[in-house]
């Protein structure tokens, strides 16, 4: 079965909210070695249904990147109640991956739901540990910068990225997006003790875009560059002008926004990263 289409009359489209620790896995997208989140989820679906099921996700996360709420859909002719999908699939998943909720979406002749293409916007968190000494307890869960960072300067710099822009300067050379033009809705930067949280909300993101933005904001925060530098980087529209891609450890896919008509049982953006 193909998660990309729902043409069969008897087919049902099921949507899952999936949370995972990305540290043990080589990203979302399936690979020959099978060490990805998609591979493990589809294996669990097979064990539960005894059918081969192909999934489609809202955003393909890289190796080491986590998800508070990845959204996934697939098609099936099987009839199961939603809690059965949650409990049954979780039985066969490793401890670092869990289905948090399941929902069936109604057939819409004008537009079938698609986890990726039906999304209106996305939100990512980046959690950064800012302390002279690294924390073993945050290994794989947060980025680390040992030099003191100025939050106010980073906030000033981030304001230059708001609105619709060509984000080529923050785009990976491997990026396959058709257009580098995206709309940045908000960038929020907060500090609690030694933890700094970047919350980035846009209509869509380019490959490595969040990590490249965070890396560039760190250059501003540690005094390497002035806040106005980020405006120049954006205008330059070339990857060479921005800072190097920052580590994946602290990046979390937090929320995918959809039209309320789909009635997905999504949670609000979770704050447990602060706890």
From Swiss-Prot:
Locate the residues binding substrate: 124
| Alphabetical list of Pfam families matching this protein | PseudoU_synth_1 (PF01416)
User: What EC class does the entry list?
Assistant: isomerase
Could you tell me which InterPro entries the record lists for this protein?
PsdUridine_synth_cat_dom_sf, PsdUridine_synth_TruA, PsdUridine_synth_TruA_a/b_dom, PsdUridine_synth_TruA_C, TruA/RsuA/RluB/E/F_N
Q: Please verify whether the record's keywords include Membrane.
A: no
GO aspect biological process, one term: tRNA pseudouridine synthesis
| Keyword list, A-Z | Isomerase, tRNA processing
- Alphabetized GO MF terms: RNA binding; tRNA pseudouridine(38-40) synthase activity
Q: Which domain of life is it from?
A: Bacteria
Q: What does this protein do?
A: Formation of pseudouridine at positions 38, 39 and 40 in the anticodon stem and loop of transfer RNAs.
Full protein name: tRNA pseudouridine synthase A
The opening ranks of the lineage are: Bacteria, Pseudomonadati, Pseudomonadota, Betaproteobacteria, Burkholderiales
């Amino acid at each position: 079965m193909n998660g990309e289409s729902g043409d069969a009359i008897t087919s049902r489209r099921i949507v899952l909210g999936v949370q995972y620790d990305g540290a043990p896995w080589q990203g979302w997208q399936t690979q020959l070695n099978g060490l990805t989140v998609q591979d493990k989820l589809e294996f669990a679906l097979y064990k539960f249904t005894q059918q081969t099921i192909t999934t489609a996700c809202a955003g393909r996360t890289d190796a080491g990147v986590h998800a508070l709420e990845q959204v996934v859909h697939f098609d099936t002719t099987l009839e199961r109640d939603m809690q059965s999908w949650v409990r049954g699939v979780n039985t066969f998943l490793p401890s670092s991956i869990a289905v948090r909720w399941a929902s069936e979406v109604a057939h819409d002749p004008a537009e079938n739901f698609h986890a990726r293409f039906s999304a209106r916007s996305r939100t990512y968190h980046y959690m950064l540990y800012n302390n002279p000494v690294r924390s073993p307890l945050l290994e794989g869960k947060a980025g680390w910068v040992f030099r003191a960072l100025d939050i106010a300067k980073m906030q000033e710099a981030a304001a230059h990225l708001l609105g619709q822009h060509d984000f080529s300067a923050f785009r990976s050379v491997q990026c396959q997006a058709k257009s580098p033009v995206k709309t940045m809705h908000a960038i929020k930067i907060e500090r609690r003790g030694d933890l700094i949280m970047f919350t980035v909300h846009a209509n869509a993101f380019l490959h490595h875009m969040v990590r490249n933005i965070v890396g560039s904001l760190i250059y501003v925060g540690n005094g390497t560059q002035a806040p106005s530098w980020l405006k120049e980087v954006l205008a330059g529209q070339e990857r060479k002008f921005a800072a190097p891609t920052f580590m994946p450890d602290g990046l979390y896919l937090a929320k995918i926004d959809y039209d309320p008509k789909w009635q997905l049982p999504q949670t609000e953006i979770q704050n447990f990263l602060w706890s």
